[in-house]
Amino acid sequence: MKLSDLNLKGLESVFVDANDVELFPPQEEAIRAGLLDTGKNFVIASPTASGKTLLAELVMLKSILHASGKCLYAVPLNALAYEKYQNFKAKYGGIAKVGISTGDYESSSRYLERYDIVILTFEKLDSLTRLKPAWLRRISVVVVDEVHVLGDEKRGPRLEGAMARFMSFNPRVRVIALSATIPNAEELGNWLQASLIRSEWRPVPLKEEVFLAAKGDREIIERVEKEVEEGSQVLVFVNTKRGSASFARKIAAHLTVSSKELGELAERVDIGVDDLSDLVRHGVAYHNSWLHPAQRKAIEESFRSKGAGLKVICCTPTLAMGVSLPAKMVLIRNYRFFTLGRGNEPMPVCWVKQVFGRAGRPEHDKYGIGLIVARSEDEREEIEDFYINGDLERTESQFSAAAMTEQILATIVAGANHIGTDRASILEFLDSTFYAYQNRTQMALVKAQMDGILEDLSDEGFITITKSNEEEVKATGFGMLSSRLYLSTKSALELREGILSLDAWEREKGTKISDFDLLLLLCKCDEVVPLKVKASMEIAANLSDNIEWLYGGAYALGSAIVAHAWIGERTYPEMKEKFGIYPGEIHNDVYVLGWMCYAASRMAEFLQAENMRARLSMLKDRIRHGIKTDLLGLVSIRGVGRVIARGLHSAGFQNPAEVAKADITQLEMVPGVGKKRAKKLKEEALRRM
């Protein structure tokens, strides 16, 4: 079957070569099963690069062009969302409006209703189902990519809750679920009342093997060298960030690759904190959360470019669920990974298969190679039995008590947008989840858990249970705000109690509340990843006079210290030298804290703590730009960041009005501005007047 055999009315301009495009076997099977001709839900489980995404695209495009539909495409990570957005916009921008939304969880994002296809993260999908904007009812198709994330401890419950709520208030929506590794796909299909397409077919054959490296890393490096010499690219998975960078250095020391393109890439990724640019000149890079987004983007683009680009990337496990970076060979150097609270444990078989799925580039390789390293003959046999010949783990719902608490509150809040809710409707929601489908015999226990959770939520002020009718449950203002701000109940309580305590200390005791105290409040929340900083208590003691407050948030001191240095206008190299923290970690810390600061300012507003609200609102802007307070006016000029703002301030400009009145020649003299930017800068300052 060819693409031209399908009814592609309206898509001729997109698929101009349709007559020459032969559908892959899984694609043909899905088409024959009615994917494009019925309103059924579908679960499509097939290997990477077997054509799942194109099938989802065809479903969306047919709905848009033939039925005026609107579609959502949900993915697990921000980076993956942007990759899909760029890809879809390039391919379909001429016939459909493509949008993206990955943050701003409190907003119903009404602007999204103007788009035909919206790419969003699972978290954004979850937040929208809590807000239930009217435009969401007009969605005709929801594509859930990487649906096996339902089995992820952190993201799974939010995806599951979002899917259950969405199907409840929009029962006509079509759900297209995609996955490369989900052994119990029939179970998922039954939950979604979906047709199942399952296939093991790959466009490029895959060789899965155990690589014995009894003599150490030198044997692994020689194997990588061999592939590079033959013109191939290699992904090497290492179990830690430090390990991925260290192994990249080992490989770079043995490669003699060089090109003009690699030299240019080295310049792009050099921000003065480590030897990444030196590695890149040898055709090697590491890929982990140390990278700033700009560095990561440059590295990924180079690796995809084939030819004279990067040959080897040493990465951490998170890349397995990230952007598309196919390579001829994928090598897993370490299959045991450290998990907080569990120590070193073997990675799941599903993860290994997901990683191996990246091996073999269609149109480039005759076959792909997936290798997993063993250090002894006994270990080789164990790995072969467990990973090469073993069974995939079932995807199990991760609805723990904590996850259930958040999702029950989210459902109560979602119900409040319409007719309210009661115990029966909450139980109905729980009964519609994947968890309930997998645990039918446990529903009596689930009901008991629900009753206990409702009592706890009531005691903590998130909901009220009507005394005259204990079946009626309503979200309080605090509960509604917490859920809409996308806070865990624990974080919402931390913010409420912290804001009230700091406000009282300042008003009643005359305690000076520093910016660092406010940052530490934010860093106590679950959403912020703790960063390790040497001598953190000594540093913190110089930033706050409130010793009791410092000890209460000791585990979060590192993140607060890094954020404080950021708003103090410290540079990446300075922070790396002083704290040992990398640009990517700083960026992630600042990104999350910016949102948490906004959430805290909204919480302070709700609590009528006006001084705290004003302080937090200002702090939010400083976190966003990484500036001291004297630059707040200057960064309001479009296109002005922390470096140019400080240059303007040092040159005597205090605010947009002074910039607007300046001569172009004056602005040209400011470091970082120059002739090209000066005119634009003045124009933007005038707009601020």
Regions found by a protein language model. Name each.
Residues 164, 183-250, 285, 289:
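Conserved interdomain linker/interface between the two RecA-like ATPase lobes of SF2 helicase motors
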Residues 329, 336, 348-384:
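Conserved segment of the helicase C-terminal RecA-like domain
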Residues 2-45:
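Conserved pre-motif I regulatory segment
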Residues 133-169:
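SF2 helicase catalytic motif II
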Residues 410, 451-460, 464-639:
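C-terminal helical accessory/scaffold domains
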Residues 47, 72-73, 82-85, 89-99, ...:
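Conserved C-terminal RecA-like helicase domain
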Residues 104-140:
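Conserved helix/coil segment N-terminal to the catalytic DExD/H
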Residues 62-83:
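Conserved SF1/SF2 helicase motif Ia
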